[in-house]
Every structure is written in C-alpha cells, then in structure tokens.
C-alpha cells in the first residue's frame, strides 16, 4: 500500500495496493497493453487484402456470422481487455469516417506498437517515441499528397469510380461479381449525389436484402423497396400511377386516453355499437378515397373488418411499415406523412409511376416495390443471396463500396494500393530521418519499419514469400523512382498498381495513418494500470 504522513507524523493510506486492486506500472504496464493491442492486430492480419481470409463468429445463442469486414469482426468479438477495446474503437472510427480500411488501420497500429516496444526495451522514453511518430506521420501524410493522382469523372463517365470501387470489393464475398456490384454501388451514389457541391447523402440509399436467388440477381431500383406485402390477397398487386396516402395514425376508431367502460344489457345495444364502429371505418375509407388516393401505407396495423372494407372499396393497403421506411417513401414520392386522420388531404399524397408486389419462388415471402418516383434521389439496392449470412455480408461489402465512391466524389484524389503507398512513405521517412539529429530519429525510423507490416501481410496472405516480395518491390521503387509499385496480390505479372487498376482514396489512407498514430500515442502515454478488485470499496 502507499503511505504518506501528515504534519504530525501520523501515517495514512492513499492507495490500498493489497487484495483490493491489481496494479501494473512502468515498463510492465507498457508490455501489457502493447501485448493486448498486438494480439488484436495479429488476429486481423490474415483478413487483409484481396486474398484475405474470412472469420467465423459464433454468438452465445449459436448464431453464425462469416465476414471479412474488419469493423464487423471486432464489433462481434467479446473483448474484455481495455486496451483491446481501444483497437475496436479505432476500427469503428475508421468505419464511421471513411467506411473502408478498417482492417489495415488495426494492423498498422499493432505494428507501430510492436516497434515502440523494441525502442522501450532499449531505454528510449515513450514520450520521445510518440514525438518521433508524430514527425514521421506528418512526413507520411504530406508525401501521400505528392504521390496521389486525380481522377476525372462525371455522370456520363463513371468508369474511374467503378474501378476504385472494384478494389474495395476485391477481398469481399462478392469478389466474383465485383464489377457488377461496383456498377450498382456507383450508380446508386451518382443518383443521390450533387456533383457540383460534392455532396452525397447516403441515407437516401436503402440497402434491402432477401435470401434466395443468386448474388448476381442483386439489382438497383430507382425507388423504394419495403419488406411488406399488400394486406389482402384479393387486392390489386400492381398499381400504376399510384397516389399514396401515408399514415402514422392507426386505421381504427380512436381510443379514449382515460379509463372507461361501456355497459351493454341488450343485444340491440351491441348491434348498435357494431354499426357505429363500422360507420366510423366506412367514413375513414371514404375520406381517404375522396382525396384521390389509390394506395394506403400505414405505420400501424388494422383489423380484418377495416381490411375487408378497404377491399370492398378497391383501395389497396399496406400495414406495419416501419417509421424509417415511411420517411424514405415520403421523400421519394413527394408525399407528406399524416399523423392525425383529420388532416388527410389530396395535397399530402405521394406519387409513384408504379407500385407492385413481388413474390419469391414457392415461398410466401413478398416485397413491395415503389418505382418511377418524382424524387430520383431515393434509390434501393436489393441484394439477393443463397442464405441470410451471404446477404448480410454482401450488404456490408456494398456499403463499403458506397462509402469509397462518396469519398471520391468529395475528394477525387487517389493513391495506389498493393502496399505501394506504405512502401513509398517508408522510403521517404527513412530518407528524412537522416536529417533528424535528436534521439527521435530512432522513432522516425521505427515508424517507417512499421509501415512494412501492410505489404508484408498482403504478400503473406497472397501465398507469396513476404520478405522477398517486399525487398524486391522496395528495390524496384528506388531504382525506377516509381511510387506506384506494390505487391502483386492478384498474380498478374506486374507490380504496377496503376496498370492493375488497384486504387485507394487519399482521404482513406491519410485517415488510416492519423488514426493509428493517435491511438498509439494514447496507449504509449499510459504507464500505470489500476484494476479495481473485490473488496475495494470495503
């Protein structure tokens, strides 16, 4: 325990270090949290690149998840160590900001900490290490700008965007159809993008999936798809020139907010009550029909009596539609959501050229497709696959491609993949380290060595001799002064990533370096770990 003495010489306890707490200090603390971070990094390393392996996650209730997405893997891992949780948050930050590169940022952070551990063992203070890392990171991010290229695209020329999205999908489960999936993702983003303002709202793109069919059956719908069907089997399944009434209020008589009861003593009274309720339903249906609506979409359900009245009045309806779906339908059709039935009017109706119910094979599954909407800024990517697991992974993959395309519209600069940018930055940092006279030179060189972890992992995952491949590409970059040379993961007999059309976005790679460096700095500044134990509050 830690004791201090007051002005009278009496001792008192500041921190009780016995059974109540577990404590690590100094170099032991650094070793502990560097080991935790390296463990997470090593788990993720085999998932990096186009030949990266998938991970199977099995939850406590037996639900199986197979994925290659770094953020998803870490999100579903049961991590108890607090430093390991920082690595999970690191991947999530990359996913939230960029949408791609979630595996690479964790591998890079683990490599930086591994190099830092070697410097700490040599007696270099962690403060000097992360100061050197800051210097090296600044050199790397500036060098990325010098080796980047700008790509030109327009609504009529989306091929450069498609090729960049294909790089993102190369390691995913959809890689056999990555050309088709990239085209779908790019066309979806272009549909909702304002190219003049370089603004993209991905919330206007809905990702919907249904198991059954093949991955290549995935399609882009210029409209909204909802996982619901028409409420009655005898109602029309195809509505042309649809005028849609959107309701968030229940399609039923209002219920009093206070406690009440009705006493019925005669059969005639019960009959009158039923007639009043039926009249209320009839008035509601007539009020909707009077607006000119020929389709009702309701957030809440309605009973069979209301459903039968709707059928009699030839008014198709859809019930139990989620609030978010209702908002997207309103945005696409130009309609306004009605919260009180008294407010139903013709000017609040949404419009669509075609609304149709589509079924799947021999199953009872159905979905509603709302197409030819006035607002073309709302689209749906409808994903198909052999089972739910494939559909969900395909949706995650397409989401990454959407994010990459959005980033390119915001900033059209790209750097080349295959580890070429890391190798080029490593060479630049090593050259600049010669001009640093202080002890930080060791940390700067360590940063350059840490960058080699990315091309080494790419080569190893592709079945290539990792060290030999890295050495060869480094020598070629120095000899030819060509920063586009990287690891030939796809075995195409050329190391020129421009010729292979392997691209990364400049903002994505820059963010990787900055986030990894920030987390490493945070971890290196921790020199004392205090864990509360049982009985600590006694």
UniProtKB/Swiss-Prot annotation:
SUPFAM superfamilies: GroEL apical domain-like, GroEL equatorial domain-like, GroEL-intermediate domain like
Role, per record: Molecular chaperone; assists the folding of proteins upon ATP hydrolysis. Known to play a role, in vitro, in the folding of actin and tubulin.
Gene3D superfamilies the UniProt entry points to: GroEL (3.50.7.10), GroEL-like equatorial domain (1.10.560.10), TCP-1-like chaperonin intermediate domain (3.30.260.10)
Gene Ontology cellular component list: chaperonin-containing T-complex
Family that this chain belongs to: Belongs to the TCP-1 chaperonin family.
Name of the encoding gene: cct5
A UniProt-annotated Pfam family: Cpn60_TCP1
Keyword annotations from UniProtKB, A to Z: ATP-binding, Chaperone, Cytoplasm, Nucleotide-binding
Protein origin, superkingdom: Eukaryota
Xref: PROSITE patterns: TCP1_1, TCP1_2, TCP1_3
Biological process according to GO: protein folding
Complexes and interactors: Heterooligomeric complex of about 850 to 900 kDa that forms two stacked rings, 12 to 16 nm in diameter.
Keyword Chaperone: yes
Keyword Translocase: no
CDD domains recorded: TCP1_epsilon
Lineage: Eukaryota, Amoebozoa, Evosea, Eumycetozoa, Dictyostelia
Protein name as catalogued: T-complex protein 1 subunit epsilon
GO terms, molecular function: ATP binding; ATP hydrolysis activity; ATP-dependent protein folding chaperone; unfolded protein binding
Localisation: Cytoplasm
């Amino acid at each position: 325990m830690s004791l201090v003495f007051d002005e009278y010489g009496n001792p008192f306890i500041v921190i009780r270090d016995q059974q109540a707490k577990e404590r690590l200090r100094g170099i032991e603390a650094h070793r502990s949290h560097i080991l935790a971070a390296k463990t997470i990094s090593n788990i993720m390393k085999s998932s990096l690149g186009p030949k990266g392996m998938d991970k199977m996650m099995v939850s406590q209730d037996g639900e199986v998840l197979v994925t290659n997405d770094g953020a998803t893997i870490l999100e579903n891992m049961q991590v108890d160590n607090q430093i390991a949780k920082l690595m999970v948050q690191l991947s999530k930050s990359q996913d939230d900001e960029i949408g791609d590169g979630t595996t690479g940022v964790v591998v890079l952070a683990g490599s930086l900490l591994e190099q830092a551990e070697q410097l700490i063992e040599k007696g270099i203070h962690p403060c000097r290490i992360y100061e050197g890392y800051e210097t090296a990171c600044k050199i790397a991010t500036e060098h990325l700008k010098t080796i980047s290229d700008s790509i030109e695209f327009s609504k009529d020329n989306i091929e450069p965007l498609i090729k960049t999205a294909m790089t993102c999908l190369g390691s995913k489960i959809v890689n056999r159809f990555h050309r088709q999936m990239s085209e779908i993702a790019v066309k979806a983003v272009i549909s909702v993008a304002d190219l003049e303002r370089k603004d993209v709202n991905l919330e206007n793109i809905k990702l919907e999936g249904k198991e059954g069919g093949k991955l290549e059956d995935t399609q882009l719908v210029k409209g909204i798809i909802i996982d619901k069907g028409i409420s009655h089997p005898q109602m029309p399944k195809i509505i042309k020139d649809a005028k849609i009434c959107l309701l968030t209020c229940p399609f039923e008589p209002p219920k009093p907010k206070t406690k009440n009861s009705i006493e019925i003593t005669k059969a005639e009274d019960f009959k009158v009550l039923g007639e009043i309720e039926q009249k209320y339903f009839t008035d509601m249906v007539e009020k909707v029909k009077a607006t000119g609506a020929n389709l009702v979409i309701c957030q809440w359900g309605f009973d069979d009596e209301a459903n039968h009245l709707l059928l009699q009045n030839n008014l198709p309806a859809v019930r139990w539609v989620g609030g978010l779906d209702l908002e997207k339908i309103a945005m696409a059709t130009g309609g306004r959501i009605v919260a009180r039935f008294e407010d139903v009017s013709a000017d609040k109706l949404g419009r669509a050229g075609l609304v149709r119910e589509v079924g799947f094979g021999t199953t009872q599954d159905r979905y509603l497709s709302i197409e030819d909407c006035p607002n073309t800024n709302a689209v749906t990517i409808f994903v198909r696959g052999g089972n739910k697991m494939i559909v969900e992974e395909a949706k995650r993959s397409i989401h990454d491609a959407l994010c990459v395309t959005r980033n390119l519209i915001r900033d059209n600069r790209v750097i080349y993949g295959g580890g070429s940018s890391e190798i080029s930055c490593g060479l630049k940092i090593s050259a600049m380290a010669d001009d640093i006279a202080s002890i930080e030179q060791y940390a700067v060189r360590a940063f350059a060595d840490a960058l080699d972890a990315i091309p080494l992992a790419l080569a190893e995952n592709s079945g290539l001799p990792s060290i030999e491949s890295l050495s060869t590409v480094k020598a070629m970059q120095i000899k030819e002064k060509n920063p586009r040379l990287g690891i030939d993961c796809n075995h195409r007999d050329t190391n020129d990533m421009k010729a292979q059309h392997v691209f990364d976005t400049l903002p994505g790679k820059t963010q990787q370096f900055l986030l990894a460096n920030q987390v490493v700095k945070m971890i290196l500044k921790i020199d004392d770990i205090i864990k509360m134990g049982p009985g600590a509050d006694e």
